Amino acid sequence: MAFNHRKMLLSCLQFKDLRFCFRQYPPPPPPPPPPRELSLLLPTSICVVGSIILFLFLVFFLYLHITQQRRISAASVTPGDTNQQEDEDETEERDFSDFHHVWQIPTVGLHRSAINSITVVGFKKGEGIIDGTECSVCLNEFEEDESLRLLPKCSHAFHLNCIDTWLLSHKNCPLCRAPVLLITEPPHQETETNHQPDSESSNDLRGRQDSSRSRRNHNIFLPRAQSDLANYCGSGRVENVRRSFSIGGSLSLCDGINNATRSGRQFYTSFSANLFSSSRRVRNEQPIPQNQMPSVTGNTS
């Protein structure tokens, strides 16, 4: 029910003391408090903190499990396996240490005396002795009357400092890669040529020994086949043997074959005689059966 504020004010103004109005009409109630947000914040914070603690526990247990497995595997490894692993590691380190880049590989060049023996000429533009007007090592142009070193084979010219530094680690021209000095033949070739007749004589001696061994082998095998060849050789017709044997060698070969044939015939004759005598002896030693024995009763009667 709505109140008429004017009437209330007028009725209060009639009294001198204004507290009477407040006693009769109390003040309005205070506004309601705001809704409690702490009721939702507390459970969420508890869940977040609990999940973080649980995650840390899982990580800690996983770390303990991994370290325990590593200890077990290390204890189960034999000393031989550990030594093999150490050897493999050392081999890998050695291979890696042996690896060098191209510019770190040491190369062998010419001696200082050989470098100084190369011709030094003065540069003059109109002469035409030197091809080009610049050094291929430092790429600087030649100056008039400048001392240059002229390589003997390819006739390329370079500055003295440039080519001397190059030739200390190389043996060829930096421009065309031609060898700077001629390669002389080693002196041991002369000794090889001197010993060559000795080697040829030793080879001849070896050939003779091999031929004598082959003759001995021919004396043992196939006497009947060799007899045909011996008859052919004994007929007086000796043909030239190609390449390896001379006429004297063929005659000696025929003589050897004849001797082998004679020995083969003697062996065959003695063998057949021994075989015949042994078979005859066996027949004499065999007992005679009773049915084949001659009867003596007829003669006694």
Swiss-Prot record:
Secretion signal span: none
Gene: ATL55
Pathway: Protein modification; protein ubiquitination
CDD domains attached to this UniProt entry: RING-H2_EL5-like (cd16461)
Effect ascribed to mutating C138S: Abolishes the E3 ligase activity
Gene3D superfamilies, alphabetized: Zinc/RING finger domain, C3HC4 (zinc finger)
Positions with biased composition (Polar residues): 287-301
Subcellular location: Cell membrane
UniProt KW Zinc-finger keyword: yes
Protein's GO biological process: defense response; positive regulation of programmed cell death; programmed cell death; protein autoubiquitination; protein ubiquitination; response to bacterium; response to molecule of fungal origin
Residue ranges, compositional bias (Basic and acidic residues): 188-213
PTM description: Auto-ubiquitinated.
Name of the protein: E3 ubiquitin-protein ligase RING1
Function: E3 ubiquitin-protein ligase that may be involved in positive regulation of programmed cell death (PCD) by facilitating degradation of negative regulators of PCD. May be involved in the early steps of the plant defense signaling pathway. Undergoes auto-ubiquitination.
Induction summary: Up-regulated by chitin. Up-regulated by the fungal toxin fumonisin B1 (FB1) treatment and pathogen infection.
Enzyme Commission number(s) from the entry: 2.3.2.27
